[in-house]
Amino acid sequence: MLAIISPAKTLDFETPAPNFPFANSQPKLTAYSQQLIDICKQFSPAELGSLMSISDKLASLNVARFAEWQLAHNEQNAKAALFAFKGDVYTGLDAETLTQAQVEYAQVHLRMLSGLYGLLKPLDLMQPYRLEMGTKLVNPKGKDLYAFWGDIITQHLQTAMDEQGDNILVNLASDEYYGAVKPQKLQATIIKPVFLDEKNGKFKQISFYAKKARGMMVRFILETQPTSVEQLKAFNYGSYWFDEDASGATELVFKREEQA
């Protein structure tokens, strides 16, 4: 089983990563990342702010990040992706409290999609950046990052699936990031968990809760190491429960009553 998640805009490069007795890994697609960096380096703060719809302060920060980005990744200029990303999904995942065995399992069974890096293993080193997959960054391959990455992410996902031993892909990414995957080119059974929260008597997807729940589902996978879709249905973290009637063969619906 392979799970995919989105990255996060919020990063933490100040807190040291947990000290495990194994080495971090190198991101595989940095030659492509360098091409994107070279394009992004050409923008002024005002141009970058306009492209990304971010504040002047954030634009200046990211102009500096692009300028400082290096092709060589090491412990001095980079941090393992699993511990660098912060945000709602990663709050639910709570990576800092994973055991060594769970992190090693994640290295095989979890991937993060990324606008700059394409696809990251949890222990892949990454440098601070902001480049969302939906950014309309004109590049030699087209008008946006979906055109830039083309089949590359899908091919590397297929390789990861082949290496981990079965054909179940659990899509816990946002639509923006999953748009960079070409499911028709994957030899996979793609499962999409959906998390609905009760609001005023009706169940609906509430972004903040859904993101956190995706992270909790990743945590569940790392802790229980399921090998079948049936085992995924046992997910009950955060008071969610599986709704058989609302679910389909590839869409698993989990619901939670309104919180008091």
From Swiss-Prot:
**InterPro entries recorded:** YaaA
List the PANTHER family. Answer: PEROXIDE STRESS RESISTANCE PROTEIN YAAA (PTHR30283:SF4), PEROXIDE STRESS RESPONSE PROTEIN YAAA (PTHR30283)
Single Gene Ontology BP term? response to hydroperoxide
This chain belongs to which protein, by name? UPF0246 protein APJL_0596
The family database entries (HAMAP family) matched by this protein are listed as:
UPF0246
Q: Which organism is it from?
A: Actinobacillus pleuropneumoniae serotype 3 (strain JL03)
* Family of the protein in this entry: Belongs to the UPF0246 family.
- Domain of life, source organism: Bacteria
One GO CC annotation: cytosol
Pfam families hit by this protein: H2O2_YaaD (PF03883)
